[in-house]
């Protein structure tokens, strides 16, 4: 199974108010193993970045001035995610922004390019009801080192989320591993 653990950084909170993606990153997981393949791109949004958003990710409009626009990277991004399950923390936020960017290009929704979308925030809320379930809180709870995360960044956050997701779902492969081990030790007697 091929999965892309995905994150974006944006100019603000709402694409309906003209906010844009300024960074997108995905790390590839195949059969529950990181492959070291990733997609990462900073994007020129052709607009100002809200102060609140910049305080979260530290990315300035000046830094993005010479970066490509989403239209320039859309096809390579879509090729990277094609056919994969997307795993995203607070998926409606990122999917909403991706769909807004694709709509500006006359392209269909991101879900037409991927197998499915899994929201790790929803998973975390189901697994840890009543607890904080931010990426930082999950890293702390699952003992994943995020000490190098001073600001949000799409690639770093996708890498951390991959570790979080694999830890949160680690029991899901337990039965298949036991079955595979048992299947190897089964012998058939033909009478």
Predicted regions and their residues:
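Catalytic subdomain that performs nucleotidyl-dependent activation
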Residues: 114-132
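Alpha-helix termini
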Residues: 20, 38, 71, 132, ...
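Acidic, Mg2+-coordinating catalytic module of metal-dependent nucleases/exonucleases
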Residues: 85-91, 97, 134-190
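Conserved non-catalytic scaffold segment of RNase H-like nuclease domains
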Residues: 1-115, 125, 137-151
